[in-house]
């Protein structure tokens, strides 16, 4: 029996909608990253993007445990000397709640062109509305 290798043109991709309300950030992000990679499918192939599209709603209602609301820091750099910027979880969730989930999931995906393609299939929105109703996403319980 030959080992099956998925072909990019034959991969069946589904759309799923995930409600982040009351979910723990890390546990939610690991399951989303797993589904974006396609590891939940029997035809998973490491060098082919076999993952599904994931739409996350209610991003502002995601939660973290312990004192991470004030202690968890997000860093970025302007590119200039001394240009390191930081913001904590509490301020970032108020300013741009989508970035919290996007950052957590992006860190769990491969750091290569294939990982960037997987990341593009993630759509995160604050609030319960999203513009992907035409794709008829199925609800995914995590």
From Swiss-Prot:
Keyword Lyase attributed: no
The keyword Ribonucleoprotein is assigned to this record: yes
GO cellular component: a single term: cytosolic large ribosomal subunit
One GO-annotated biological process of the protein: translation
Domain of life: Bacteria
Pfam families associated with the record: Ribosomal_L13
Alphabetically ordered keywords of this record: Ribonucleoprotein, Ribosomal protein
A GO MF label: mRNA binding
PANTHER family xref list: LARGE RIBOSOMAL SUBUNIT PROTEIN UL13M, RIBOSOMAL PROTEIN L13
Summary of subunit composition and partner proteins: Part of the 50S ribosomal subunit.
Function comment: This protein is one of the early assembly proteins of the 50S ribosomal subunit, although it is not seen to bind rRNA by itself. It is important during the early stages of 50S assembly.
Family the UniProt entry places it in: Belongs to the universal ribosomal protein uL13 family.
Name of the molecule in the record: Large ribosomal subunit protein uL13
Organism the protein comes from: Pseudomonas paraeruginosa (strain DSM 24068 / PA7)
Gene that encodes the chain: rplM
């Amino acid at each position: 029996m030959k080992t099956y290798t998925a072909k990019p043109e034959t991969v069946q991709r589904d759309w799923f909608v995930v409600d982040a309300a009351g979910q723990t950030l890390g546990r939610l992000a690991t399951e989303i990253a797993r589904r974006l990679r396609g590891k939940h499918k029997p035809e998973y192939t490491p060098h082919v993007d076999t993952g599904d599209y994931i739409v996350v709603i209610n991003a502002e209602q995601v939660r973290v445990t312990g004192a991470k609301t004030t202690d968890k820091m997000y860093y970025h750099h302007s590119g200039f000397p001394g240009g390191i910027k930081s913001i904590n979880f509490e301020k970032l969730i108020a300013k741009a709640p989508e970035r919290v989930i996007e950052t957590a999931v992006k860190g769990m995906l491969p750091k290569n062109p294939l990982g960037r393609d997987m990341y593009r299939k993630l759509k995160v929105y604050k609030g319960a509305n999203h513009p992907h109703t035409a794709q008829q996403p199925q609800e995914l319980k995590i």
